[in-house]
């Protein structure tokens, strides 16, 4: 089983306008939910996530997200793609 790890930053600005600005800057808005903790909005680097999705194991493996120095073990639950561009739009992760 492959090990996947991605770096993320907590999101302060929420909403569609903020998400649009992130996408233009080469980032992906995402959310982590599940477990006994509150949902957390995060930002990921688009190119690193896109590169990880080229490996089919990414969708069924445990992923380690490093968020501001803390590690979260998650699995990917949803990944939204642009209808015709090779772009990711949003990701949902669930805590393991």
From Swiss-Prot:
InterPro entries: Rbsml_bL25/Gln-tRNA_synth_N, Ribosomal_bL25/Gln-tRNA_synth, Ribosomal_bL25_long, Ribosomal_bL25_short, Ribosomal_L25_dom, Ribosomal_uL5_bac-type. Keywords: Ribonucleoprotein, Ribosomal protein, RNA-binding, rRNA-binding. GO terms for biological process: translation. One of its GO terms (molecular function) is structural constituent of ribosome. GO terms for cellular component: cytosolic large ribosomal subunit. Belongs to the bacterial ribosomal protein bL25 family. This is one of the proteins that binds to the 5S RNA in the ribosome where it forms part of the central protuberance. Part of the 50S ribosomal subunit; part of the 5S rRNA/L5/L18/L25 subcomplex. Contacts the 5S rRNA. Binds to the 5S rRNA independently of L5 and L18. This is Large ribosomal subunit protein bL25. It comes from Francisella philomiragia subsp. philomiragia (strain ATCC 25017 / CCUG 19701 / FSC 153 / O#319-036). The lineage of its organism: Bacteria, Pseudomonadati, Pseudomonadota, Gammaproteobacteria, Thiotrichales.
């Amino acid at each position: 089983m492959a090990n996947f790890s991605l770096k993320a930053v907590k999101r302060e600005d929420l909403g569609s306008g903020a998400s649009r600005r992130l996408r233009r800057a080469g980032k992906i808005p995402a959310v982590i939910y599940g477990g006994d903790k509150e949902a957390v909005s995060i930002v990921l680097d688009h190119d690193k996530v896109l590169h990880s999705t080229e490996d089919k194991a990414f969708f069924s493996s445990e992923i380690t997200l490093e968020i501001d120095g803390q590690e979260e073990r998650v699995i990917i639950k949803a990944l939204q793609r642009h209808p015709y561009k090779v772009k990711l739009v949003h990701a949902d992760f669930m805590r393991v």
